[in-house]
C-alpha cells in the first residue's frame, strides 16, 4: 500500500464551510476512486488546514485511479467550486514502516 497525505490550506474563516462542501459534494465522487483513511483539521502549525489521507495499492494504482477521476464529469464540475476556498495544496506520498499497523 501507498498513502497520499493531501493537505489543503483554506481561506481564513472558511474551514467549516469548505469541509461541509467537500463532504457533501467532493467526497462522494472521489470515494469511487480512492479509499479515505481519515480526515483531520490542523490545530497547530499552518492553521486553516485540512489533511486527508488516501490509500492506494501502489503508485500505478494511484495514477490509474487519478486518471479516471480526472475524466469524471462530476469531479470536473466540482473543482471550480473547490478552488475559491484554497490558499495552498500539498501532496506527500508515504510508505508504511514494517511495524506500522497500517500496511
Locations of regions flagged by a protein language model:
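Short, structured motif recognition centered on aromatic/hydrophobic residues
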Residues: 2-6, 18, 30, 49-54
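Glycine-rich beta-strand-turn "strand-cap" elements at beta-sheet edges
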Residues: 11, 32-51, 57, 74-103
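Short amphipathic alpha-helical segments
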Residues: 14-38
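Residues within well-ordered alpha-helical secondary structure of globular protein domains
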Residues: 21-24, 68, 81-84
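Short amphipathic alpha-helices within nucleic acid-binding modules
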Residues: 16-20, 58-70
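Surface-exposed interaction/gating patches
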Residues: 1-17, 98-103
Amino acid at each position: 500500500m501507498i498513502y497520499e497525505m493531501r493537505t489543503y490550506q483554506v481561506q481564513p474563516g472558511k474551514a467549516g464551510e469548505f469541509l461541509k462542501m467537500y463532504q457533501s459534494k467532493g467526497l462522494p465522487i472521489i470515494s469511487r476512486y480512492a479509499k479515505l483513511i481519515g480526515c483531520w483539521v490542523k490545530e497547530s502549525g499552518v492553521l486553516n488546514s485540512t489533511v486527508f489521507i488516501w490509500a492506494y495499492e501502489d503508485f500505478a494504482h494511484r495514477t490509474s485511479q487519478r486518471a479516471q477521476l480526472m475524466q469524471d464529469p462530476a469531479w470536473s464540475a466540482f473543482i471550480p467550486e473547490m478552488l475559491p476556498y484554497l490558499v495552498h495544496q500539498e501532496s506527500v506520498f508515504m510508505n508504511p514502516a514494517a511495524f506500522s499497523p497500517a500496511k
